Each structure stands twice: as C-alpha cells, then as structure tokens.
C-alpha cells in the first residue's frame, strides 16, 4: 500500500491469478500470472519475503523477470526471503545485499557481499532483512524510484 500512497500503480503477480493469503491472513488479489508479466512494462520489481520465495524461485518465469530487471538496471527491491529469487536467478555476484538471517549463508555462497543491516542499497538494488526493517526498506525503495524516474 505504501507504493500506492506514493502514487504508483501496483500489479501483484504470482504463479496463477486469483487470491493469495499472506502470513497474517490478509488476502491479496493476484492481477497477473507470472507468465503474463512483461518486465519492460514495469519500473520496479518488488520481491516480498515469507515462504513464497521458496516456491517462486523454482518458476522459470519468476527467474526470467528477475534477470530481465537486473540486466536492464531497473530498480529491484527484495526483503526477508525475497532475495532467494535473486540467488536462483544468479544475479547477485559481487552485489551488496542483505536478507533474513537463515538465508544469509546461501546469499554469500551465491557471490553476494552480505551486510547485516536493516537496508542495503547497491545501485538500483534495495534489500532488507525482515518485516521490522520495512520502514527503511520502503523509504529507500521510494527514494530510488524518485531518482529512477528523473
């Protein structure tokens, strides 16, 4: 909702259309299946955390979207377990990043430069560790979008 407050149109994508239920029982409408997403039509890729990245990282469409954003040097924001998708996409080598503590070793093995900070910004890549870091994560994501749109 913070991105919508900042005046951005938001589409939620997942394996298929319909509804998904978040950790605290909130339902979210899925606007597009991953296969329907054209990365060139979007300014920002947000990879939320929780349990979903463990499934999404096995989806070829999710990997292709992440690779396209990183290759195009477009803003990418990942929090908690979200960086697992970037790990599977092979796009973190030499990049500064953070993630949920249980993913940290995997992040390092993928060639990322792990930093245990509430938010890490490396170019147009924004990463955070956990839900408690959301204020810093959102602040940096919105700031980055402001720079990217100029």
Regions found by a protein language model. Give the residues of each.
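Catalytic nucleophile serine of serine hydrolases
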Residues: 80
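Extended, subdomain-level signal for the structured scaffold at the beginning of enzyme domains
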Residues: 1-76, 84-93, 104-150
